[in-house]
């Protein structure tokens, strides 16, 4: 098992960011920075990091605000400007990794982390040598307008900084319907029962986000998709790999990824790759065919970092 090293950074508002890094022997080929999904944490990517390190890559993963062992308020970014803060946090980690290794940085964003990564690319794309988007969504802004309004109402009724099971059920409640009869409420995560059970048993996973996090996330998606539609801020030379399972309820598989790829290409991005894994669910890096996914990721990384 690859041994991780803990690191801390000061955020732009003086909050402390906590993360892990996994380093190869010698100078890395490049650095991969991971932006994790909702209700999980950076340490869940230990296995993926081990495969990347074995191939000569350094890997960094911090815990987004409200996530992980050191969350001040679980499932909460900030009282004000939370979306800007999490994008700025990601910039701090990317800059730290770039400065430490003086090597190209590739950003890997999964699910919620993919939306943060897409916002990062719009604002700071010149810092990236590549972008991997895992289980991302497309044309979410129409739904986001409605859901942000519901989240604002939930904040008024139950508190903006309190975990809100109603919002969790509203957003995720339909995700398991395609897998009935289901063994657990989270069968949509992976076909691998051991991975699903590990997530359920992990005390740092599965917390209910607060209404304020939903307000921040939906507002961020609205602004991010508006910027992508305009296209002028997108870095045209940055290679992008979009990947998801065909049965992922967030990306909607081929449909969602294909539409996003079409938008990126229309904006002038020169290197956009789409991979949809038949039968795969939400976490392809934790799927039954994860060895194939890891091999595909390494092949893509090796190509763009050659």
Model-derived segments and their meaning:
Residues 1-26:
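N-terminal cap/lid segment of alpha/beta-hydrolase-fold proteins
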Residues 36-40, 111, 246-247:
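Active-site glycine-rich loops that stabilize anionic/oxyanionic intermediates
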Residues 49-74:
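Conserved alpha/beta-hydrolase
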Residues 87-103:
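Conserved acidic catalytic loop of the alpha/beta-hydrolase fold
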Residues 108-113, 117:
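Gly/Ala-rich beta-loop-alpha elbow adjacent to hydrolase catalytic centers
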Residues 242-244:
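Short beta-strand/loop motif that positions the catalytic acidic residue
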Residues 265-306:
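Catalytic active-site module of serine/aspartate enzymes centered on a nucleophile-bearing elbow/loop
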